[in-house]
Amino acid sequence: MDNGASSYRRFLDGDESAFESIMKELFRGLVFFIDGFVHDTHAAEDIAIDTFSDLVVHRHRYNFKVSLKTYLYMVGRSRALDYIKHRKVIDFVELSEAHAVADEAAALEEMVLADDRKRQVNSAIAKLPEDMRVVVHLIYFEEMTYEEAAKVMKKNRKQVDNLLYRAKKELRIILGKDGELLL
């Protein structure tokens, strides 16, 4: 799943229905995400609409290096924080609570980015040959030693070492230059 990137490419090529598809797929989730910052559903909807408008007006800003969903959530977060900063209504929230909200926002952004990275890595792992998939799973997900993985796979330690080396190399190729950061 590309989280809207292919639809956005179709939109850039002139397919207006592709943008509607993006809106249907991502709008509600973006509103919910923004509402977590502003605690006002109507304002969150307005900010989400502005975020999608920004995508149309400033087409060159999205560079396909992250998923479209991640990009929209980053822009939405930024707009939500701007809204909070410039809101004319003075909240009776304590300053310490405001810092906690900002810390939660940063943590939430990290979670969204981490989820996107996990999906990319899991998708790349699924493309590996079976032996490589198994060794990656045993070593990194099951946290087995090379010796334990070798026993499970009925291979010797050197074979496991070689398989893991080739698997990492293949993952870097599949993930592209961003793979260096993910692995």
Each language-model region and where it sits:
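Sigma70-family region 2
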Residues: L12-D13, D50-S67
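N-terminal module of bacterial RNA polymerase sigma factors
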Residues: M1-G29, G36, I173, L183
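Arg/Lys-rich amphipathic alpha helix in sigma70-family domain 2
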Residues: V57-F64, M74-V93, A114
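Internal acidic/polar
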Residues: I90-A114
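Residue-level preference for hydrophobic side chains embedded in well-ordered alpha helices
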Residues: I22, L26, L30, T51, ...
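Conserved RNAP core-binding helix
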Residues: K24, V31, T41-H58
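DNA-recognition helix of helix-turn-helix
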Residues: Q120, A124, M132, F141, ...
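Short helix-capping/turn signature of helix-turn-helix
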Residues: E25-R28, G36-H39, H137-M144
